[in-house]
Amino acid sequence: MKRIVLASLCCFSSASMAAIGIAEDNYQDNERHRLIETKLFYPTKTTASETIFAENIAFYGFKAAKSATPKGRNSPLYILVHGTSGNWKNLSWLGSELAENGAFVVSANYPTYTTGQATPESVLRMWEQPRDVSFLIDQILSSDYAQYVDKDNITVIGYSLGGYTALALAGAKFDIKGYQEYCHQYNDASCDYYRNALNELSQQERLMISRTKSALSACQARPALRLVSTSHRSSN
């Protein structure tokens, strides 16, 4: 049975913290014409070429050795999913901690949702991000990285829109009518952002949103897939 974690995330710990390796890979989904730029964090023994990644005005970065060789086998696999106008750095504070504790972590810039690409119209076409996650999992498990991860221990962690994606992987559906009724009743900033885009969604696109679950059979078939939706601490 699929295990789902929604309320909290309990990080595992190890006797000693590992050094972090980081790699960059681009995965092209030719069927959907989507290029997904990824960063992979993982435990390594290499520290000689460490540099600082993902530092900004709000958060300290983390030290990692670029293109270092991963160490260990059967590491839990974590897929991090950013929110609207976010990017791979947003959850790097968490990804780096997980990697230090022995996890293999994949963070990505999800096209049409990421910094510089997201618009109200593109974000409402929310069925693509869950498909991106499913595609990424397949790519990792069929790559050279597969030797380092436990295919039966996979967790998806999402923030904001990424939180919806994690829930969608569990079968959640976006209720457009309910959202429009909410916006009619309350003066929410998100309603202003999406108002025109909601009105312009075609009937086919509305059906795509309501049927997101049917596009995720690959993820649903993974009995150990865990899903975490978060709504706190983000940086751009």
Report the location of each language-model feature:
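Short amphipathic alpha-helix adjacent to the substrate-entry channel of hydrolases
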Residues: 70-74, 86-109
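N-terminal signal peptide c-region/cleavage motif recognized by signal peptidases
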Residues: 13-16
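Alpha/beta-hydrolase active-site loop
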Residues: 122-147, 151, 168, 173, ...
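Domain-level recognition of soluble alpha/beta enzyme cores
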Residues: 19-78
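Gly/Ala-rich beta-loop-alpha elbow adjacent to hydrolase catalytic centers
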Residues: 158-162, 166
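The conserved beta1-alpha1 loop
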Residues: 76-83, 232
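Residue in the alpha/beta-hydrolase core beta-strand immediately N-terminal to the catalytic nucleophile
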Residues: 153-155, 227-229
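Catalytic nucleophile-loop/oxyanion-hole region of alpha/beta-hydrolase
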Residues: 85-97, 114-135, 147
